[in-house]
């Protein structure tokens, strides 16, 4: 497998994350909640589940495709570190409700999205 392909996919994922996050966070209403980070993480969970189901469950794609797209593109598209920084920032400014909602929704919907993607990809 080519590390270059993983790097190119990672670069594309990072740019996609930046564009999606900027588009969502740049909408009217300010940034009281980190919707951009939330959206890319939920979408990435769904897509990684789908990709895994298509590779493992159905065998429609080569395992190398899962590595390039999963570790490369989706690894750069999603962002655990920014999510944690957003949680820390909400706690630092005393907005415990926003931190709790972010943690609960991101975790719960992220798991649900991954499960749904896996079920769709697997064909169950």
Curated annotation (Swiss-Prot):
Entry keywords, A to Z: Cell membrane, Ion channel, Ion transport, Membrane, Metal-binding, Sodium, Transmembrane, Transmembrane helix, Transport
Subcellular location field: Cell membrane
Keyword Hydrolase attached: no
Gene designation: fluC1
Record family assignment: Belongs to the fluoride channel Fluc/FEX (TC 1.A.43) family.
Function description: Fluoride-specific ion channel. Important for reducing fluoride concentration in the cell, thus reducing its toxicity.
Binding site residues for Na(+): 75, 78
HAMAP family for this protein: FluC (MF_00454)
Keyword Electron transport attributed: no
Gene Ontology MF: a single term: metal ion binding
Activity regulation statement: Na(+) is not transported, but it plays an essential structural role and its presence is essential for fluoride channel function.
InterPro entries linked: FluC
GO cellular component, one term: plasma membrane
Catalytic activity: fluoride(in) = fluoride(out)
Membrane protein topology class: Multi-pass membrane protein
UniProt-recorded name of the protein: Fluoride-specific ion channel FluC 1
Domain of life: Bacteria
Biological process annotations from GO: cellular detoxification of fluoride
Matches recorded under Pfam families: CRCB
TM segment ranges: 4-24, 36-56, 67-87, 103-123
């Amino acid at each position: 497998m080519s590390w270059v392909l993983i790097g190119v996919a990672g670069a594309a994922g990072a740019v996609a994350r930046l564009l999606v996050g900027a588009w969502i966070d740049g909408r009217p209403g300010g940034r009281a909640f980190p919707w951009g980070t939330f959206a890319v993480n939920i979408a990435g969970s769904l897509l990684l589940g789908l990709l895994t189901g298509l590779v493992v469950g159905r065998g429609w794609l080569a395992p190398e495709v899962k590595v390039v797209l999963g570790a490369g593109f989706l690894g750069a598209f999603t962002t655990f570190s920014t999510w944690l920084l957003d949680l820390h920032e909400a706690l630092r400014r005393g907005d415990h409700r926003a931190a709790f909602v972010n943690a609960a929704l991101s975790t719960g919907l992220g798991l649900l999205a991954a499960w749904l993607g896996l079920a769709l990809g697997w064909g169950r």
